[in-house]
């Protein structure tokens, strides 16, 4: 999986990759509807982030979407998802959800076919994807080899897609007749799934939340550089777009027909969510934080966080 080619404008994958990134910028890190966010995040895995995926599907065709997600997460597991991800609280919380996530639509169909069959038997049977993942993780915890890692990734992709299907069918993840329980369960499963999806996407993008591209007063030797001076020495690169002015300050806008804008790129684990929120306050309402492809001086590409104009761009959906 050569993720570096995703962001090269001369690549056939560029349009698909930037379309996925636009979804990520609009939804995945927003405070909007969590079910919609989950759909958009899964869209990025199934149809946006290209990888070397023989199961890729078009935007108007649902066939193969589950296989696409399973395949991409399997590849990500092999190449990018470390033991820290699998030992982390987000993955383990999803793994140990009780009761397990089951295929609501298949349970509904089986109950109609066999109305006298005990519901708990049907639910257990249709929890097979989640239960298989648990068994494979037990083996993975013992062996930690490549084969187990790929298998865990594939099954994790299937589980995430199952959550998506449950949401889409409207039944979601209900496990009882009580509406309050249903709402609590829906939100809990979606929250856990979305946390895992975000981490997978961040890994596939090269953890852009720990990179910051700057072009204005935060640059070295400029008046506000002290706010990020502890992040270390920057790399140098460029982004494609245009610069407008908001008062005395430049505002970047991502645009496919724009110019190469020079930027400094800082990479540091100090760019925590708390640190970025403080930078959000400093930048103010004229700017919004987003991900963008950056071209380095050696011709390679990486995705970085940048503060851009708080308006729709040519890449916006």
Name every feature range the model reports, one short phrase each.
Residues 32-43, 89, 151-162, 185-196, ...:
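Short, well-structured alpha-helical interface segments that form or flank functional binding sites
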Residues 206-317:
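Glycine-aromatic micro-motifs
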Residues 2-144:
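Helix-loop junctions and short alpha-helical segments
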Residues 43, 49-50, 172-174, 219-220, ...:
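Short, solvent-exposed loop/turn segments at secondary-structure junctions
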Residues 46, 50-53, 165-173, 198, ...:
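Charged/polar positions within long, soluble alpha-helices
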Residues 129-140, 154-165, 181-208:
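Amphipathic, Lys/Arg-enriched alpha-helical patches that create a basic surface
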Residues 170, 174-183, 224-227:
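Short conserved catalytic/interaction loops centered on acidic-Pro-aromatic/His motifs
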Residues 105-157, 164, 273-276, 280, ...:
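A charged, amphipathic interaction segment
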